[in-house]
Every structure is written in C-alpha cells, then in structure tokens.
A protein has these predicted regions:
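Short, conserved active-site loop motifs that form the nucleotide-linked donor/cofactor pocket
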Residues: 1-3, 121, 171
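Conserved Rossmann-fold cofactor-binding substructure of NAD(P)-dependent oxidoreductases
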Residues: 2-27
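Alpha-helical elements of Rossmann-like donor-binding domains used by nucleotide-donor carbohydrate transfer enzymes
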Residues: 14-17, 27, 57, 108-109, ...
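Residue-level signal for alpha-helix termini/capping positions
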Residues: 20-23, 63-64, 115, 157
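N-terminal Rossmann-like NAD(P) cofactor-binding module of classical short-chain dehydrogenase/reductase
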Residues: 26-29, 71
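Conserved NAD(P)H cofactor-binding loop of Rossmann-fold oxidoreductase domains
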Residues: 31-35, 74-75
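A conserved pocket-lining segment of Rossmann-fold NAD(P)-dependent short-chain dehydrogenase/reductase
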Residues: 40, 127-174
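Catalytic helix-loop patch of NAD(P)-dependent Rossmann-fold dehydrogenases
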Residues: 42-57, 64, 68-69, 78-147
Length: 174
C-alpha cells in the first residue's frame, strides 16, 4: 500500500486532483461507502447517491488517468436471502435492501466499465468477515477496534504490524 488518500468521492475535482498529484497510481482499492443496512432502508437516496455516484466519479477519473485496476469492497448483502448454503460466488444476487442494491448496481457498472474501458475489477463480498453480531449488539464503532479488516487497514496506513486485540474471540471464516 503506497498511499492512503482520504477524500470525498462525491467531489470529482478532489479525485482528479488526487490522481493528478499521484501519477504513479496504477490501481485503486475502493472501500468508501455507507454500509448500515437499517439506515439504507430509512434513507435509500443517501446510499444510492453516495455508493453509486461516488463510485461513478471514481471510475470516470480512473478512465481519464488510464488506471485500469480496482479492488471493490462489495457485500454479501448483494445475495439477499440465501437459496442454499454455503453461499458461493455463483449464488443468485437478489438484494433485499438499498445498501445491497447499491453495491450490486456498482458491480454491474464495473462490468460495463470493463467492456467499455478495460477497467478490471475484483469484488470482495464480505459476510461480516470480522465477527459482526447478527443481533446488532456489536456496532461499527469500537474503541478499541475489534474487527480484523479495520485493524489491517490501520496497520497499513501506519506501516506497523497488524494485531488482533480480540485473540480470545473467534473470527468467522470465509
């Protein structure tokens, strides 16, 4: 990880400026999105605008700067209700909430950008990969952070070794 860039994907000028200032960027890891299912049901426009429009802005800037690789943080919410278990990549995608639909829409957009511009994508469809509680007793704000993926990203940004502060708790395998 060469650079962690904080910004707002809803501002295309910020993306353009960032890519202009960093011409050696050859790939993007895209984790920026709203991700609360319950909130997405109450305020779907917020999720569609942020998750879809923000990604379109990013893809357009990537196209303009010749960046043709992206890792996209999608979600298992694109699958909807399981038709079989365990769920695999070939499982039908039928989201049941705006959050899942916003992520699936972005996946379809990425298919179109691949066909039109050659932007290759890898999509990560997480299943509460770091131990989130299905009863929502564990939220997204932890002090100290207890989820694996945020700890790995923090370590990458700080260029330190990632640690697991909850060694006694099991992580869900995926």
């Amino acid at each position: 990880l060469k650079a962690f860039i904080k910004g707002n994907l809803l501002n295309p000028q910020d993306i353009e400026q960032t890519l202009k200032e960093n011409p050696d960027i050859t790939a993007v890891i895209h984790f920026a999105a709203y991700s609360q299912v319950a909130e997405s049901v109450k305020n779907p426009g917020k999720y569609y605008r942020n998750n879809i429009v923000g990604t379109l802005n990013l893809l357009d800037a990537m196209t303009h700067h010749g960046i043709c690789q992206i890792v996209f943080s999608s979600t298992a919410a694109t699958y909807g209700e399981p038709q079989y278990s365990p769920i695999d990549e070939k499982h039908p995608q039928n989201p049941v909430n705006p959050y899942g639909m916003s992520k699936l829409t972005v996946e379809h957009i990425m298919d179109d950008y691949d066909k039109a511009y050659g932007i290759k994508s890898v999509r990560l469809r997480y299943f509460n990969a770091a131990g989130a509680d299905t009863n929502t007793r564990i939220g997204e704000w932890h002090q100290p952070e207890t989820h694996l993926i945020p700890n790995i990203l923090k370590a990458a940004v700080q260029q330190t070794q990632a640690t697991n502060p909850t060694e006694k708790k099991a992580f869900q395998l995926y």
